[in-house]
A protein has these predicted regions:
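A short SAM/SAH-binding and catalytic strip from SAM-dependent methyltransferases
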Residues: 157-168
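Conserved class I S-adenosyl-L-methionine
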Residues: 100-108
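Conserved SAM-binding loop of SAM-dependent methyltransferases across substrates and taxa
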Residues: 111-119
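S-adenosyl-L-methionine
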Residues: 2-93
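Rossmann-like AdoMet/SAM-dependent catalytic core
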Residues: 222-226, 230-234
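Adenosine-cofactor binding site in Rossmann-like domains, unifying the SAM/SAH pocket
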Residues: 125-153
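C-terminal substrate-binding/active-site "lid" region of AdoMet-derived donor-dependent transferases
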Residues: 167-225
Length: 234
């Protein structure tokens, strides 16, 4: 079944913050913008931040490291987004006696794993091949492993993939293994579209934000897609 809904853009209502709230979350008069992922913000705060960046014409440069931490940003995390992802992972884990870890592959700087760990009832491990494609600052605790080697090493109970490289076939090979997977990204710009020929369940998240969105038009282009997962977990 080929996904169709996300080949178009997703639109939803986003509440407006007042001006005081918008200004307090960042200093738009400084030489560099604050790092939105320095700590986890609410969806409303994150949306307002990027709406202002878009007004200034700075979304692309900001996401390419023009912020106080020099952080590259692809998916934009918020409290609500992380909480709903963690809830699905916890339901998938259930009450199993065995405790293999949750594994994030292609994790970049591992920020999603950091945000998820306090909410997930299993040890979370972040890995990345560090292939030099982007100028990402990798913390030492992000283990240098490509996706297949990481899976072979840790035999995870659940796998997270966020912004798989465009036209990569790795996601398809991983889904074929039968391990529960959360695939996060823009179906038109991440991974290979053939992955959606396999059975999957979209989260249809109201809180998914990314660098590709058109914030002032409230057009959002990413979601979480679950493979090898039961509908009752979502």
């Amino acid at each position: 079944m080929i996904i169709e809904i996300f080949y178009q853009t997703r639109k939803c209502f986003v509440p407006r913050m007042n001006c005081a709230d918008e200004v307090s979350m960042t200093n738009f008069h400084s030489d560099e913008y604050d790092d939105i992922h320095c700590s986890l913000k609410s969806f409303e705060e994150a949306f307002a931040f990027f709406e202002q960046l878009e007004r200034n014409g700075d979304v692309k440069s900001y996401c390419n490291g023009a912020n106080k931490s020099g952080r590259w940003i692809f998916q934009i995390y918020s409290t609500e987004f992380v909480e709903e992802l963690a809830a699905v992972i916890n339901r998938a884990l259930g009450r199993r006696r065995k405790t293999p870890p949750v594994l994030e592959i292609m994790s970049g700087d591992g920020r999603l794993t950091e945000f998820l760990q306090p909410l997930v009832k299993r040890h979370c491990i972040a890995t990345d091949s560090r292939d030099g494609r982007y100028n990402i600052g990798y913390p030492k605790w992000v283990e240098t492993l490509d996706a297949m080697d990481a899976i072979a090493k840790y035999s995870p109970s659940f796998i997270i993939m966020c912004w798989e490289p465009y036209l990569s076939m790795t996601g398809i090979e991983i889904v074929k293994m039968g391990i529960p997977v959360a695939w996060i990204g823009n179906p038109n710009m991440c991974g290979h579209t053939d992955i959606f020929d396999r059975y999957h369940i979209p989260l249809e998240s109201k809180f998914a934000l990314s660098r590709h969105d058109i914030f002032m038009e409230k057009e959002f282009k990413t979601d979480v897609f679950f493979f090898n997962c039961k509908p009752k977990w979502i």
